[in-house]
Amino acid sequence: MELRLWFLFGLTVTSAAGPVPRPQPGDAGRSGVPRAPSATKETMAMVATRGPSPRSSGQEQEPGPFGELAAKGGPVRYRARRCTCFTYKDKECVYYCHLDIIWINTPERTVPYGLSNHRGSVRGRRSAGPSPQSSQPSRGTLRCACAESQDRACVYFCTRTLAARGASRTPETPDKEAGKPAGRATGGLHPRRLKSRTDKARRL
């Protein structure tokens, strides 16, 4: 029993110490000298060739319009929410308004991760639409509520309904084609009857 405990203790100590490096072919006679890993050497060489980082030299970068850093390679901060969608099922609206959203798709449901970080009460979140006293269109015609009323692009996006988007994507037909019967040009049925393979086999 005691022998087993000593054996387990020895295994624990050796596993905590880490693996012993193998001697390389050109290391004859230097087996007792500890070597730095090659990855550490490469990292030190890269830092030495790059020089000091821009932050350490005192050059502070200014955040961009939504909080991200405007210049190269700096850490990106969380951007402000541009607007609040009335329904999270409208994915285009969610991607437009919530700029830092990550969607977690599971077989059971699609969860918008990060939307619960909204600052404000739950009641305020539910009543994100315009108040009944306002002269703006009703909630049925709006997709979202903009954080800033001066943001024209956001106001345009939020007032554009799903039906209007669908109508704007379909091309309008000129008046000339309106009177033509449905045929090949307009995507109607082919005038000849298509024959199946069995019909062809009966002929033979």
Swiss-Prot record:
Residues 1-17 form the signal peptide. Residues 18-71, 115-140, 166-204 are annotated as: Disordered. Disulfide bonds join C83-C97, C85-C93. GO terms for cellular component: extracellular space. It is found in: Secreted. One of its GO terms (biological process) is regulation of vasoconstriction. Keywords: Cleavage on pair of basic residues, Disulfide bond, Secreted, Signal, Vasoactive, Vasoconstrictor. The record marks W103, I104 as: Cleavage. Residues 18-80, 104-204 form a propeptide. The keyword Disulfide bond applies. It holds the Pfam family Endothelin. GO terms for molecular function: endothelin B receptor binding; hormone activity. Residues 127-140 have a biased composition (Low complexity). InterPro entries: Endothelin, Endothelin_toxin_CS, Endothln-like_toxin. Residues 144-158 are annotated as: Endothelin-like. Endothelins are endothelium-derived vasoconstrictor peptides. Belongs to the endothelin/sarafotoxin family. This is Endothelin-3. It comes from Sus scrofa. The lineage of its organism: Eukaryota, Metazoa, Chordata, Craniata, Vertebrata.
